[in-house]
């Protein structure tokens, strides 16, 4: 009857005798491993020496075997520990799994329980490359993975966040696996709110050229709708660009002035520049000067569909596309050889055009000598802003006025009025039409004060003996030109932004009627007169927000010679330098 009890007790003592020598041998190897890998993770729990708990563990397993022999239900209240014979580490099984024999690599149980323990392959140094145990259970239970708590150098476990907090990565093979540091960093970046891969930010210059002219056009429309000519509205415009892309930074803020009944009243125009650039001086204009458009990023296009399409897409013109781009240089840079480069596209067209056309293009691309370029650079360089560089026509041009002719700067009244007087002096020569030019302050005063305010402006001048009358128009932040052709009895409004000026032409036509009746006592037949706003496709249009003053001056230059207007936007840098020399020497080239 008690024969089974004797067999069980004998089994207990036999297991205790067998487990002591292997445990000591494995303990030494485990202690060496723990010492070797203690630098990997200081928080890792070292393996303990099997003492009394090993005996208790064997007793419980023996009782379990006895219960299984007689068919009694028996469950362990604690988790049995399995000692791997391969690496000497102990694994704690989940509460739902029971091992019948912990001393071997293959565990077999009674009844329908059939558990198989699979260990990872050993590395040459005796350490398992994959320190995990797979247990396959055949009774409707999913396969479970039993990770080992003893990690090796090439094993995978926790990943650390930048803040020091740990987080584990899910893995169908192992829930505790260390990943290489490089891979962990990559996954961490990619999983945290998608910050791993970002599209690079577009540079400030990219796309500005495409929107430059459109923004300027919308500004003009908004100012036109905001009120009448006497309305006051501040403007602040900030444009950011870089030296390498042939753009500067200019912040314009302030007020302009207009003459009204002998008193200058404030009008919506910038009065002061604040220029930031790597070359050249800091330029600030006088507060009493009314300035045209400010320095804005250049959107000059090349001749041809290819360059025009690139500009529409917002791409910057590459400096190596053609020699024409090199001609768009900075004023004041001191480069002498750039102006003498021939534009390849224009040279090609010159071969196919007539002699008159070729002469006109050659005249526009007149080369400047080194002495001329040196003189221009000195005028645009450092120096007192109030220094007078040219004086004529009862006008004085200072260094600050000349520096408005730098690329991307807005021209002021003094520069435009001085240049218009140079046109009048040239047309006094034989072969040019009789020309009269009004000041830039004429139209604002006429509009605000009527004919009586400007009645004395033509004292000693008979307008009806002239052939062409030019009236520069300044509307808030934009320059345009009205051409009165007395030979054809017509008024034409030229705007580099394509705006219409019917109301301006009507005011000037009424002025001619009053002038004729006062000076000649003759009424004009207004039915014989026409006025017309030039359409954008009929005259060159500016492609940026800074060259409207230059376009106005060149409109006047070509019309005063009775020549068709054939210049383009890309010629503006050359025209600016030529105008500097012409003002300094008080003669046109």
UniProtKB/Swiss-Prot annotation:
Span of the annotated motif Nuclear export signal: 317-332
Subcellular location: Nucleus, Nuclear pore complex; Nucleus membrane; Cytoplasm
Region (Disordered): 148-179, 191-210
Active-site residue numbers: 478, 495, 548
EC numbers on record: 3.4.22.-
GO biological process: fat cell differentiation; mRNA transport; protein desumoylation; protein transport; proteolysis; Wnt signaling pathway
Function of the molecule: Protease that catalyzes two essential functions in the SUMO pathway. The first is the hydrolysis of an alpha-linked peptide bond at the C-terminal end of the small ubiquitin-like modifier (SUMO) propeptides, SUMO1, SUMO2 and SUMO3 leading to the mature form of the proteins. The second is the deconjugation of SUMO1, SUMO2 and SUMO3 from targeted proteins, by cleaving an epsilon-linked peptide bond between the C-terminal glycine of the mature SUMO and the lysine epsilon-amino group of the target protein. May down-regulate CTNNB1 levels and thereby modulate the Wnt pathway.
Modified positions (Phosphoserine) in chain numbering: 32, 333, 344
Family to which this protein belongs: Belongs to the peptidase C48 family.
Bilayer disposition of the protein: Peripheral membrane protein
Keyword field: Cytoplasm, Hydrolase, Membrane, mRNA transport, Nuclear pore complex, Nucleus, Phosphoprotein, Protease, Protein transport, Thiol protease, Translocation, Transport, Ubl conjugation, Ubl conjugation pathway, Wnt signaling pathway
Species for this entry: Pongo abelii (Sumatran orangutan)
Domain comment in the entry: The N-terminus is necessary and sufficient for nuclear envelope targeting.
Record text on subunit structure and interactions: Binds to SUMO2 and SUMO3. Interacts with the C-terminal domain of NUP153 via its N-terminus. Interacts with MTA1.
GO molecular function: deSUMOylase activity
Protein name: Sentrin-specific protease 2
Disulfide bond as UniProt keyword: no
Annotated stretches, region: Axin-binding: 71-382
């Amino acid at each position: 009857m008690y024969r089974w009890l004797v067999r069980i007790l004998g089994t207990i003592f036999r297991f205790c005798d067998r487990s002591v020598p292997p445990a000591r041998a494995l303990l030494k190897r485990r202690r060496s491993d723990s010492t070797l890998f203690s630098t990997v993770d200081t928080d890792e729990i070292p393996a303990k020496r099997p003492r009394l708990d090993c005996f208790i563990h064997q007793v419980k397993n023996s009782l379990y075997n006895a219960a299984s022999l007689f068919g009694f239900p028996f469950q362990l209240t604690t988790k049995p520990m399995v000692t791997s014979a391969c690496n000497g580490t102990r694994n704690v099984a989940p509460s739902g799994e029971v091992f019948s024999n912990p001393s071997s690599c293959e565990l077999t149980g009674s009844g329908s329980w059939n558990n198989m323990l699979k260990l990872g392959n050993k590395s040459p140094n005796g350490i398992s490359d994959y320190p995990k145990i797979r247990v396959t259970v055949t009774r409707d239970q999913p396969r479970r993975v039993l990770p080992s708590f003893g990690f090796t150098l090439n094993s995978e476990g926790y990943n650390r966040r930048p803040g020091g907090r740990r987080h584990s990565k899910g893995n169908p093979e192992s829930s505790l696996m260390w990943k290489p540091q490089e891979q962990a960093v990559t996954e961490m970046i990619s999983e945290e709110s998608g910050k791993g891969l970002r599209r690079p930010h577009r540079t400030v210059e990219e796309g500005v050229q495409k929107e430059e002219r459109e923004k300027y056009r919308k500004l003009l429309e908004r100012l036109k709708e905001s009120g009448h000519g006497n309305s006051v509205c501040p403007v602040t415009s900030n444009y950011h660009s870089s030296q390498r892309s042939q753009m500067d930074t200019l912040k314009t803020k302030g007020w302009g002035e207009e003459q009204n009944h002998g008193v200058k009243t404030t009008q919506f125009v910038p009065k002061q520049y604040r220029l930031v650039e790597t070359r050249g001086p800091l330029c600030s204009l006088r507060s009493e000067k009314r300035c045209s458009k400010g320095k804005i990023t250049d959107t000059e296009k090349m001749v041809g569909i290819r360059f025009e399409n690139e500009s529409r897409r917002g791409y910057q013109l590459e400096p190596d596309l053609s020699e024409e781009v090199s001609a768009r240089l900075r004023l004041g840079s001191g480069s002498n050889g750039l102006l003498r480069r021939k534009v390849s596209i224009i040279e090609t067209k010159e071969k196919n055009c007539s002699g008159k056309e070729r002469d006109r293009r050659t005249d526009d691309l007149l080369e400047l000598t080194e002495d001329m370029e040196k003189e221009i650079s000195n005028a645009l360089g450092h120096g007192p802003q109030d220094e007078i560089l040219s004086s004529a026509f009862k006008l004085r041009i200072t260094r600050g006025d000349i520096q408005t002719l730098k690329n991307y700067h807005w021209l002021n009244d003094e520069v435009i009025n001085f240049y218009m007087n140079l046109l009048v002096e040239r047309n006094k020569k034989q072969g040019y039409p009789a020309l009269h030019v009004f000041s830039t302050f004429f139209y604002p005063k006429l509009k605000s004060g009527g004919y009586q305010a400007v009645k004395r402006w033509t004292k000693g001048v008979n307008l009806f003996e002239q052939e062409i009358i030019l009236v520069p128009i300044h509307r808030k932040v934009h320059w345009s030109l009205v051409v009165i052709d007395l030979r054809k009895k017509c008024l034409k409004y030229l705007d580099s932004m394509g705006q219409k000026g019917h109301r301006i032409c009507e005011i000037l036509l009424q002025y001619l009627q009053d002038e004729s009746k006062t000076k000649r006592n003759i009424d004009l037949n207004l039915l014989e007169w026409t006025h017309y706003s030039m359409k954008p496709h009929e005259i060159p249009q500016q492609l940026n927000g800074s060259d409207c003053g230059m376009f106005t001056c060149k409109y006047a230059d070509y019309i005063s010679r009775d020549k068709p207007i054939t210049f383009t936007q890309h010629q503006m840098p050359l025209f600016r330098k030529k105008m500097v020399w012409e003002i300094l020497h008080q003669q046109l080239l």
